[in-house]
Amino acid sequence: MTFRTRRKRLNKVLLFLRRSRAPRMASGSDGGGTLAEPVTPAPRAPGGRNRMWIVIVAILIVAIIGISTYAVLSARVPTKVGIELWYNNDGHYGDTETALALTLQNSIQSCGRVTVSLKSDPWAVYKQNWANQRMPMFLLGWYPDYFDSDDYASPFLSIAGAKSLGSFYNNSQVDQWITEEQSTVDPNIRTDRFTKIQNALADDVPYIPLFSGVAQTAYVNSVQNVELHPVVFKWFIVDKPGATVLNVSTSDKVISLDPASAYDFFSGEIINQVFDTLVVYDWKNATLKPGLAQDIPTRANGLVSADGMNYTYHLKAGVTFHDFPLNTPLTAQIVANSINRAIRLDLPGSAAFLLYDVGALGRDATNGNNSSPGAIEVVNSSTITFHLARPVSFFNDLMAFSVSAPVPDSYNQAGEQPSTAGSVIGTGPYKMTTHTPNQLIVLDRAFGTKASNTYYNKDLYSPTLGPIPIMDRIVINIRASAAALKQDIETKAVDVVFRTLSPPDLVDLQNRASSLGITVKLGSSPQIRYLVFNVNKVPNKLVRQAIAFSVDRSAISQIVFLGTASPLYSMIPAEMPYSTAVFQSKYGDARCADANNLLAQVPATIELIALARDR
């Protein structure tokens, strides 16, 4: 009932009451309707007037209550709740995103109480959308930054991480549990804290885990050393005997090649060919090896303090940046400056929080928004020590991630460095000589030649692999669709395709691999896919829980991925330690009755329509 309608009804009540108090008129004796003289009322009993007013007030109160009750009853929860579901539309996750969004839309809407409007944007805009809080519910994927279960918890559920990834979840108790699991290697404590963290995730539902897929690539049979690494793809180990150039194609796109900004898989993939970090990963697995540092810090070698709060790295000699002709030498001060630059800039959607929050280096406004005073100590030109605010058991892993890559002091200190050829300067095995956005990237050997390799870490994987980089040049063609990738490898226009063939194309290539002379390689993938709720735009937990009940993971796997996707019931995948399938026990799949029961409990005063507003 509208306010105007309620007002009209109240006016009618008041008019009736006024008329009931008006003097009564005698009827005309001739029946002609003329007014007679007023009839003198009978004398009232003492107190009668007061009783009349009490009756009038009582009638008014009853009328107002009745009208208000009718208004509340007529404003019950609407039959349909509206919400927007956003997805990427330019191939960042391959050609399956539209089908995935449609399948989710159907499973949510099939419960009958929610309508889902689909919206999409290219990745560069999409990334800004979640930073600017334009999207109430949206699809994302996650590839690990470091190989610890914490990397599936703190980036999503810590206050700083949730802001970076667009949920804006804020739970100080969960923050405390995260800090406690990060600070110990005791499996009993970590089991307890990860259990509590995952239970809070299932109760608060800032995210809904959906599925994990398979890693995939296809390449001509003459190509060697194509490894589906659990953290980062390494082009510098790939070999095509008898050739000096490797041609590849992908449907992925670069967002930023500044280590202080990049926080997507493909940007990180390129960064890891051009930059080095203090420690790096083995070519096949997540075992750490020395990169820019001489050794991996441990308590055993004295480079990690007994309390786990101090990590010391000694730099290898002779390392220079490929800022030719300067050939700037790497120093401990440059490493410190690079870490502080990432922390100070704290660019939107970046991984800076892995340093100042997860890595316990701090971000102090009294120190120019750099790390906390004393957190980074330059001992001498080749030695740096990090003094953490608390123990972080996987700090070495954080130093292996791209956000920790040293950059020369010539980099922009007030904002993001351009991702153009000549502006991207690292110490890695390749330098980027060409970058045509969304079309082409060319990586060339940075130091010496194959016959005279002067790269400081060329024997990193010897004797298993020869000196790195193996190929002189990597030409990365950026395609507009998965169909183009399939055509590239069918015709052998390229040597390797990576990220991302569509499920039907993948099956077709597997069936014809022998006749085509190609290898189709599949591997387990640590990547997860999930729904994000911006809890500022969808603040009612019951709404988020209702949608969690309505999701149908089996439909996603069968319809979108032809049965190749595995259902995911926690943000920590089943292959990782401490994983608990909390969403399976609490929500299951496609439980519409439970979803609708929750929506029926939502107070009528709560706004359910969570549509994005332009900002």
Residue ranges and their predicted role:
Residues 80-91, 116-118, 243-255, 309-314, ...:
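Short, well-ordered beta-strand elements
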Residues 1-78, 537, 547, 609:
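Secretory targeting signatures
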Residues 82, 91-99, 430, 567-605, ...:
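Structural transition elements
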Residues 295-351, 385, 488, 539, ...:
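Aromatic- and charge-enriched surface segment that lines or borders ligand/interaction sites
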Residues 91-94, 237, 387-406, 421-484, ...:
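Aromatic-rich, solvent-exposed beta-strand/loop patch
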Residues 249-304, 425:
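N-terminal lobe/hinge region of extracytoplasmic solute-binding protein
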Residues 26, 64-65, 96-106, 127-256, ...:
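Detector for C-terminal structural segments
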Residues 42-44, 222, 333-334, 344-411, ...:
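Surface-exposed binding/hinge segments that line
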